[in-house]
Amino acid sequence: VSRDSTRSRVYEAEAMIRRLFDRAGGAHTVQLAGTELTLPPEGRFGSSDDVRSYVERVRRMPAITERFERAVMPVAVRSRRGDRAAHYEREGATIAVPDSADGRWALRETVVLHELAHHLDPLADPPHGPVYLATLVDLVDAVLGPEAALVYRVILGDFGLRLS
């Protein structure tokens, strides 16, 4: 596995993306690169069981199965201890999300899509490299729509991150 040299920048960019979704408010509009965009409401989950159901629905969407070869592979979802991170375990194809009250920040759609993109990434090396980022943006486009995908492209680019 290659060194994951872009991980911290990816996490910083995604923190900014989450803040944009949070700020979009009831009208779901944000200003980005001089353009007003309407973002979809971001799903929030109450438990790892809710995340599991969501991941299965997304994985079986025709737009996902047609685009990503690895979508046919099942994904397990489990609770994890601690509240600082969600993560994906390639061996065992498992998404782990914190289920504690302090870990609720991770029970949101953008975080779950980040972890699901690790599952769908055909290379997984480096873990947050250009192929992964292209997979993530394609997944966001298919699930949340083109406006959300544009937000990802612009902000990832602002952080100097390249998509393949």
Regions found by a protein language model. Give the residues of each.
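Active-site-proximal or metal-binding-adjacent scaffold patches in catalytic folds
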Residues: 1-110, 119-164
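Walker B catalytic acidic pair
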Residues: 115
